[in-house]
């Protein structure tokens, strides 16, 4: 039997997933408002990375730490599969107004211009154009 994956632990210590659908806009400086409910679930520091199907994934620190541990334990021959995830990721911290700056490279990858949808997907959120 395989090991069970760790459950997402928000800062309050209660086990729950990232949920909901939110429509917002990216401003001219590439900033995106993160809704209060998502901030509560994701924490103050999280990582933006290229997701599957041309979206951006927002990972809470705890999930990102699991990726890092897994990457470090892989043999060199298998670690190349995770290189793009780390090479294109950006550590994000919220500003005083609850916004993050999405780097241009990540906006271009996901085709993000102005209007976006943020959805909760269990242990992460995703940003879609």
Regions flagged by a language model, labelled:
Residues 1-31, 37-92, 96-97, 104-129:
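Flexible "stalk/tail and boundary" regions
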């Amino acid at each position: 039997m395989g090991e069970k994956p760790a459950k997402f632990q928000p800062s309050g210590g209660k086990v729950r997933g990232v949920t909901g659908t939110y429509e917002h806009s990216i401003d001219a400086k590439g900033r995106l408002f993160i809704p209060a409910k998502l901030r509560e679930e994701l924490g103050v520091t999280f990582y933006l990375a290229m997701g599957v199907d041309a979206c951006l994934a927002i990972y809470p620190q705890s999930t990102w730490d699991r990726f890092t541990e897994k990457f470090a334990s892989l043999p060199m021959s298998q670690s190349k599969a995770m290189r793009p995830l780390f090479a294109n990721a950006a550590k994000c911290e919220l500003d005083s107004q609850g916004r993050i700056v999405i780097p241009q490279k990540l906006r271009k990858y996901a085709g993000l211009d102005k209007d976006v949808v943020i959805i909760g997907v269990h242990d992460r959120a995703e940003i879609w154009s």
